[in-house]
């Protein structure tokens, strides 16, 4: 068990580091055939050692070539993916289920950083993730092909309802990127767990917004990214959605 857990920790770290490097390139809209870069300032190509962020950690989060400070996601994305991969291994009985959970956790966590850094939930991440979810989510506990279908349909219905409900509050109240993430969560989690995910994310976002308003750190109409809350709800539902739904129903 200890050896397998260590492998999941290492695998999550590598997945997160690769996702970080790919994000750095995607922000510049560089073609897929272009070389992977570790630093956009000095254009230093990514090396195999960059899949483990130890060198940057020893260099205090700076590029080893030009010493410019790297975005904080160089640390938080790999470490977060590593921790989530370990949690998936400890949560699921089957290593295959845990591996699939770790991959989806990486995809979801990546969206947190794109929304915070660029106010964007990019199609180049969300749409391929939908395809992967439609093809692999049946591996996860409690999921079947029908759950994928009905979950996607329910996610689409919830997304449309939220878009319509947000219209009186202006164009930025609920974006199309948020809607697509809900559809992704529906495909990944199934009908019952996507309800859990949306409920948790809505509750958390509402409480967070209330605290910001009460402390006057935000004003009504200020931008607040929904992506991180949707991802939080999705990850909780991925790990414990079935149990939460059963508790609520019973």
What are these regions (language model features)?
Residues 19, 23, 84-88, 92, ...:
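Alpha-helical membrane-inserting segments
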Residues 3, 67, 93, 97-100, ...:
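Membrane-interface helix-boundary signature
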Residues 24-33, 90-94, 116, 141-145, ...:
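Transmembrane helix-loop junctions in multipass membrane proteins, especially transporters and channels
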Residues 1-92, 246:
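N-terminal transmembrane signal-anchor/hairpin module of polytopic inner-membrane proteins
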Residues 8, 97-98, 103-208, 246-250:
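Functional transmembrane core segments of multi-pass inner-membrane proteins
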Residues 72-78, 95-102, 214-226:
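Hydrophobic alpha-helical transmembrane segments and immediately flanking/interface helices
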Residues 177, 210-236:
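Interfacial loop-to-transmembrane junctions
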């Amino acid at each position: 068990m200890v050896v397998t857990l260590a492998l999941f920790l290492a695998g999550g770290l590598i997945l997160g580091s690769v996702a970080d490097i790919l994000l750095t390139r995607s922000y510049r809209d560089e073609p897929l055939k272009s070389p992977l870069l570790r630093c956009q300032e000095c254009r230093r190509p990514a090396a195999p050692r960059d899949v483990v962020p130890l060198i940057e950690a020893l260099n205090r989060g700076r590029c080893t070539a030009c010493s410019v400070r790297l975005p904080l996601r160089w640390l938080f994305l790999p470490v977060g993916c590593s921790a989530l991969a370990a949690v998936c291994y400890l949560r699921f009985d089957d290593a295959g289920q845990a591996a699939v959970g770790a991959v989806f956790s990486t995809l979801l966590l990546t969206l947190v950083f794109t929304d915070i850094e660029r106010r964007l939930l990019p199609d180049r991440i969300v749409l391929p993730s939908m395809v992967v979810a439609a093809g692999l989510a049946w591996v996860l506990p409690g999921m079947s092909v029908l759950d994928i279908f009905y979950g996607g349909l329910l996610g689409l219905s919830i997304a449309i309802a939220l878009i319509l409900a947000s219209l009186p509050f202006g164009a930025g109240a609920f974006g199309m990127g948020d809607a697509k993430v809900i559809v992704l969560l529906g495909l990944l989690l199934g009908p019952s767990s996507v309800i859990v995910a949306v409920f948790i994310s809505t509750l958390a976002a509402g409480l967070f917004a209330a605290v910001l308003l009460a402390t006057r750190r935000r004003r009504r109409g200020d931008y607040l990214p929904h992506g991180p809350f949707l991802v939080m709800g999705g990850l909780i539902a991925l790990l414990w959605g079935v149990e939460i739904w059963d508790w609520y129903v019973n």
